[in-house]
C-alpha cells in the first residue's frame, strides 16, 4: 500500500506526492498545492483585467461614486424657497389637503435651512466654542390618508420643485436582512442613482417611502416568530431614519462581504413615509368610544365624542401615537417620525376640482390628446359633476377619475382618428349616466358632433 502511495502525482504538473506539500485527491484526479496557487493567480489577474475594462467604459465612468457636488444647494437664507412659495407650487398641482401641504412646506424649508446651517458650521474655523454650537436635527414626516388622497402626488410634485435629490421607494418589497427581498439599503441606492452616484449630494436628499403601513406587524404584542417583512423591516429602518453610516452595495441586491460598498451618512437625509393605514380610524373610534363610557363622564364631553365617532373621516384628526402602536408600528419606529400629517378623504366637490383645475388635470390631458387629432373636446359642467359623483361612489379617491374617463372615452377615441371631418366633441351628463350606450353619427365637416342615445 505504501508503494502505491509513492507513485501518486499531480495530474497537472506531474510532480509526485514527495515533491509537494499537499496533494488533494478528486474523482480519478489529483492536484497539488502549487497548481492551486497558480490557478488562484490566474483568476485574480482575469478579475482585475475585467474590472478595469468595466471601470474604463464610458457608461460606468458616469456612475462611479464621487464626492463632488454638481448641483448647487441654496446656502444663503435669502435663496432658500419660503414655505409660502413651496405651498403655492403644490397648490398648482394638488387640490385640497391644506394641512398636509403646509406641513410639507415647512418641513422642506427647514430641511434647506438645516443643510445651510451645517455647511456654515463646517466652514467655520475650529475654536473653543465649537462644542457649544447648536446641532440641528431633522424631523421625519408621516403622511396618513386613504387611497387616492394625494400622498404620492404630493411627493412627486415636491420632486419637481426641489433642488435636492428626491427618491421614491416602496416598502412592500423590503425584507429583513438575510431573507428573499430587498434590503433597506436599496432605498439609499435609489437616492444615490438620482444623485448620479454623487455621495455628497445624496446625503442632502429627501426619500419618500410609500406603503409604509404594509410593514406593520400583525398584532400589537411582540411576536415570538419571525416577521421578516413587518417588524423586521421596521427594526432595520430605525438607524437609517435616525441617522447612521449605511453601507450601500453599488449594484443593488444583497450585500456581499467581498464586495465594496458605498458609505452614506443618513443624518441629513429627510424621510417622508406615507400609507393608507386601512382600519386605523376604527382603532381611534374605539378609543374615543371607551372615553365616553362611564358614570363619571361629563355629558357635554360625551356628546362631543359621540359626534366624532359618527363620522369616521374625522376620526384620524384625533390620532395619537398609541393608535399607531395598536395598528402594528413599534414605538421606536414611531418615535423617529415625530411629524404626522393626516390627509382628508376627497369629497365630491374636491373631485370636481381635481378634474379641471390642476396643471395636469384629466380634462386638460384628454383635451390635449384630442387636439392632436384636430378635435376640440369640451365637458359640460353637469358631466364633470356626474363623473365626480361616480368616482366618489367607488371610494378609491382620485384614481377612480381616470378609470371613469378612460371608460367614457374608449369608443370615442377609437373612432375619432378615422373621422377627420369632425372638429368638435361635447361630453354630456347623459353620456356619463349611460356609459357605452352612445353612438357617433357622422356629420358634414365643420359641424358639431351629435350624440344619439340608444334605447
Swiss-Prot record:
Keywords: ATP-binding, Chaperone, Metal-binding, Nucleotide-binding, Zinc
GO molecular-function term, one example from the UniProt record: ATP binding
GO cellular component: HslUV protease complex
GO biological process: cell division; proteolysis involved in protein catabolic process
Residues annotated as domain ClpX-type ZB: 1-51
Residues that hold Zn(2+) according to the record: 10, 13, 32, 35
Binding site for ATP: 146-153
Known partners and oligomeric status: Component of the ClpX-ClpP complex. Forms a hexameric ring that, in the presence of ATP, binds to fourteen ClpP subunits assembled into a disk-like structure with a central cavity, resembling the structure of eukaryotic proteasomes.
NCBIfam families associated with the record: clpX, PRK05342.1
Function: ATP-dependent specificity component of the Clp protease. It directs the protease to specific substrates. Can perform chaperone functions in the absence of ClpP.
Record protein name field: ATP-dependent Clp protease ATP-binding subunit ClpX
Upper classification of the organism: Bacteria, Bacillati, Cyanobacteriota, Cyanophyceae, Synechococcales
Gene: clpX
